[in-house]
């Protein structure tokens, strides 16, 4: 049985993929108490019991040592009066907020330094193989005066991969060139590019990156993933009359328990939908499949749009623009509305988008407020987002469903747990490459 450690484990996307590939997770760690509840609950479902055959440690990685990890593994019941095994793989995705191209980037963000702590733990545990996963922005993040684990001071402007490869080489690990993998190429119904960095202890067989398992023309679509979760029964029967194989796999389960059998979903969890006002619902109605907020605004101004069946929007625009309701309808029905007038109708937000049903989803993020369901004028449930990430339906996300404001800095509610996760099927594809050479 190959053994793995999952650091920065989050809700457990990587762990799901590793277990599907055949690994046993002996130790995992994350800093979030919200994540801990979800992660432990799932592992109990799978027969991975705290203190018996696995250990989760809620900890800042800066406080986590190889000695602590070895101690917890040695105390597991399965190793009673036995030597603890060599660790085959450490996998981890250091917090990526400072690297991300999806939002603001801050070179001084202390979270950018966590990959150095990851290298430290690798050096203290000495696994056979290592995998680091992160956002694409990881590869071109520059550091100023970075001092490595071995005391090397790197020139200002040195990029992360250069530092990482040098640091790993200094502690006895060779590395492959980092590669961008798209989750959609590995059976995930989502366009999600992630940088994967693989390393191996010097003298061992080098791993390879996985080749795509799905051709571009055969990528799974949003309809394949969540068509059976349409809430309107008549619409669901018309659009998704028969479950797809992906839907069946999600329902029946992919991740095996310690007994080797996946867990079918007895009931669907995480299906609660956000409450929406009439104005928001009517705005969502205006979007065509695949259309962004900026393109909708352009269409309103250059072509016109019929809002005669949108009473809440008519009233809003009438009051704000000081026009009679019939004049509001006429204003937007034909070309010529100004940008300011269009923004009263639509708001100034340009990032909203109605996802297209016949394509993989866009990248699932931690805030789902601006993504619109293709068949119903609403945002997505946590379960729908989890389906797009390739989580089993039996995987239940616990804790608060969402959060806001300054609490986003420390809380990891359900939507964030899903959006931060590595898609299990992507993690599985990479982990299988390690299994091949062990």
Protein language model annotation of sequence segments:
Residues 1-5:
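Extreme N-terminal starter segment of soluble prokaryotic enzymes
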Residues 8-9:
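Class I SAM-dependent methyltransferase "Motif I" SAM/SAH-binding loop
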Residues 12, 16:
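Glycine-rich SAM-binding Motif I of class I
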Residues 17-23, 42:
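A short, Lys/Arg-enriched amphipathic alpha-helix followed by its capping loop at the start of a domain
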Residues 30-34:
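Short beta->alpha hinge that forms the Motif I/post-I loop of the SAM-binding pocket
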Residues 38-78:
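S-adenosyl-L-methionine
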Residues 70-84, 94-336:
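Class I S-adenosyl-L-methionine
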Residues 253-438:
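C-terminal target-recognition/interaction regions appended to catalytic cores
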